[in-house]
Amino acid sequence: MHHTKLFDHGILINRGSTDRSVEICKLFAPHWEIRDSKVLEFDAVLVDQEVMNIEKEITGWKMVLNTTEFLCCADKHAFFSSLATLGQNMYAIRTILMVDDPTHGYTNPRYGIPLVKQRYHGRLIHPNPPAPYYGGRLIHNFFHGSYWAGRHWSPHPFMIYMYPAFVLKFFYSPWNTAMKNRKLQIGPTLSKHSIRHGLGIHHLATLDKLEKNYIHFTTSTTDLRLNSEYQVLFPDLCFPNH
């Protein structure tokens, strides 16, 4: 698994997913923990509280990612050393929203090749100072992240990590039946509390709405191989003849 090479330990919180996450974890990361969620409905506040309670058990650098999110850096040791050198306890790692270019001719992924090597179209969420940056995922060594709902923001002081490292969020990619079904399975599990407070309501979508969303996001997707920072992370994709 992608993250076994980056982190010493991993905990998969199983929320009854039907995307084979548990089976895949047992196969490729048998030393990782699998914990069944105690939150029966998808409630953004309660889910994040559960995550933070687990974080309290862990020391060192911690990062909470969804199964569709992949932390990517060029060199693991240089990355974690830089977190210490920069002197902060929390960093926002910039996110790239992966969105298939419908004209590119992508085929279904092959399981023997890392997904991050099979897709290279997306949109980088750029920080826009002085506006707060809500587009990243947080890595920290606090007792817990004190996250706001959604885990993109925290009252803890943090800085945006402006070096070649990204979270690749497979947003509308791979845009195939499996991904569509995955998106559709979340909405029915939303709690009334979340819906009432407008938390996670983007998951309340029909297939037609998803297709329209996808078309909308394709207008801003780009070939990441032309991005200089992405080239540092994936030189084999960007310069295949070198």
Kindly label every feature range from the protein language model.
Residues H9-I11, E33, F166:
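A structural signal for isolated positions on well-ordered beta-strands in alpha/beta enzyme cores
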Residues H2, R15-S21:
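Ser/Thr-glycine-rich phosphate-binding loops at phosphate-binding pockets of nucleotides
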Residues R20-L65, C73:
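Active-site-proximal specificity loops/subdomain of glycosyltransferases
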